[in-house]
Amino acid sequence: MSTFETLIKRGGNEAIKINPPTGADFHITSRGSDWFWTCFCCYLLFGLILTFLMFRKPVNDRFFYLTGIAPNFFMCIAYFTMASNLGWIPVKAKYNHVQTSTQKEHPGYRQIFYSRFVGWFLALPWPIIQICMLAGTPFWQMAFNVCITEFFTVCWLIAACVHSTYKWGYYTIGLGAAIVVSISVMTTSYNLVKQRDNDIRLTFLVFFSIIMFLWIIAYPTCFGITDGGNVLQPDSAGIFYGIIDLILMCFIPTLLVPIANHFGADKLGYHFGPSDAEAVMAPKAPVASPRPAATPNLSKDKKKKSKKSKKSKKSKKSEE
């Protein structure tokens, strides 16, 4: 057997062998891990492209690129962890829909990737920030939307890790938080974007409509039949989650970067001042030196006094 054939046989995805899913009855296989590696490559590719393009821009024009780079790299780390079959815990399923011949208990233990929710916590606020920036949303309202988005992620993380039916309480609270953010954006931000050009308003409506559909319809459905209801196998669940994650936290943030740059920061109402580097490199204006204080001319004063004294003496002599 040639060396090349040996390397080919040794190659491949061995994440499941190196990091076995000990303690989980329902877990991903090498196919699920392969899909996670595919998602990882997508996030990494788009993140690197945006980073390369960012350094071709002036310092003050890079902020929109940062809003697209951040979610891509955060989810890149999350999917690297899941593809390596790490960042998960076994949780006993509440419903006995998925079964295997090797499980010892009914229902069995399902593999729950908490690393996915950590990725959401870091990446999900960025599409919301981008949409708010298109509308010129005030900072305090933007901060409110981000905080409620993080609240949604924490609630669903707890819901995925809870065995009892109380998981649906956290699920409902988290879904309510997503609805609150959607209402906030469609009232405050939409009222602001109506005052802008039709192109910006149309972009806002198209992209946020997609975000709302994925957040309020697709994600709840996915959670209900995967981590919540134990209907789909973890491989199928990974594909379902992966498609939604790619659209929401990879494709949308990446597409919004060139669109926002096309509109321009001034048109969107953002003006970034000169950077510290430019301020240091700029030549300093010459400082006018203060004029010296006028010194009294003592010689002139003495001459004036001598003249006055001579005149007074002459006047006295004439009087005599």
Curated annotation (Swiss-Prot):
Pfam families per record: Bac_rhodopsin (PF01036)
Protein name: Protein MRH1
Domain of life: Eukaryota
Gene (name only): MRH1
Keyword Zinc-finger: no
Modified residues (Phosphoserine): 289, 299
Entry's family note: Belongs to the archaeal/bacterial/fungal opsin family.
Residue intervals on the Extracellular side: 1-34, 84-116, 163-167, 226-238
Source taxonomy: Eukaryota, Fungi, Dikarya, Ascomycota, Saccharomycotina
Keywords per UniProt: Cell membrane, Membrane, Mitochondrion, Phosphoprotein, Transmembrane, Transmembrane helix
Note: Present with 182000 molecules/cell in log phase SD medium.
Record topology, Cytoplasmic segments: 56-62, 138-141, 189-204, 260-320
UniProt feature, compositional bias: Basic residues: 301-320
